[in-house]
Amino acid sequence: MFRALITALFCFSGLALAGAGHAERIKDIGSFAGLRANQLTGYGIVVGLAGTGDDSLDYSTLGMKGVASRFGLQLPAGVNPALKNAAAVMITAELPAFAKPGQRLDITISALGKAKSLRGGTLIMAPLMGADGQIYAMAQGNLAVGGLGIDAADGSKLTINVPTAGRIPGGATVERSVDAGFATTPQLRFDLSEGDLTTSQRVAAAINGRLGQPIARSIDATTITIDAPQGAEVRTALMSRIENLEVDTAEAPARVVVNARTGTVVINGAVRIAPVAVTHGKMTVQVDEKPQIIQPQPFSRGQTAVQQSSAINVEQEARPMFEFNPGASLADIVKAVNAIGASPADLVAILEALKQAGAMKAELVVL
């Protein structure tokens, strides 16, 4: 079977299955298991700052002593230099799948201590480690800082953006690659970014139909397993063909997303409204406080007093009732809400009421 599969890979191009729905490339809706990026972190020292460093923090001093010791410089016991021109930093980077020794990585540097700005600084060579504690890259270079911080002698400050974080494009060199192990596993596994049973079935059918072999199986809403021959070269060709196949993805479920704090409402096109009548009133309560001065009668030995006078006015705005016809769509909802001049907060209340009444056939997500 695998011999026929290999022949099919090199004889056919990755064309899409015909379908009436919206077709997307398989590579855009998921990824192969194991082919992921890995996070790297490290600790380092940035030098060359114009008096905006950590000053006398203990861990900054220890870090600088460690850097000096690598060059054979030993500071006398009890000497803790004031490091206004240096700062302790945390370094982060992302190691892509299949990254090879010698390749360059972009890195982000963030101050750990009291440094006011990293502008103009240079990162001294620092190791970057993975979650397993192994060193995968070495970082060094001049920082590019977009922020600016200025302190005046009178205590006033001016800060633009974030001056305590910066980046070094290509600032790390890969020293060790990560073995993904995809060439020796019994099967390839493709994971959908968003689980959907229909899409999972369609992906498996697209692979089997294009390659002419029943090698792909939909395991669940997220996972598709693929029988594949051994060997990195053949598997790479197979994965390339699969990634570029097109499949008709399932229609997204009807969903309304509401952010009550900001008044943001997002309604997708699958939302439908059952027959229902809606009215939404607006009440305004206004309270006016007017203090009144009360003077005592002449020769009464009374005291001047202040009396509060309150006037409460309640206004309720009359708004018409509107009706949704059977199967009302997103356009109908927007048109009706705009007609009554509802605010985002009003729309949130209307949608919640529609859901409670069972008239909105959609999932309501409140952030």
From Swiss-Prot:
Its Gene Ontology molecular function terms?
Answer: structural molecule activity
List the keywords (alphabetical): Bacterial flagellum, Periplasm, Signal
Cleavable signal peptide? 1-18
- A single Gene Ontology CC term: outer membrane-bounded periplasmic space
Pfam families attached here?
Answer: FlgI
UniProt cross-references to InterPro entries, sorted A to Z: Flag_FlgI
GO biological process terms, alphabetically, are: bacterial-type flagellum-dependent cell motility
Provide the protein's localization: Periplasm; Bacterial flagellum basal body
Please give the function described in this protein's UniProt entry.
Assembles around the rod to form the L-ring and probably protects the motor/basal body from shearing forces during rotation.
**What HAMAP family is this protein classified in?**
FlgI (MF_00416)
Q: How does it assemble?
A: The basal body constitutes a major portion of the flagellar organelle and consists of four rings (L,P,S, and M) mounted on a central rod.
Per the record, the similarity remark reads: Belongs to the FlgI family.
Q: Any idea what this protein is called?
A: Flagellar P-ring protein
The gene name reads flgI
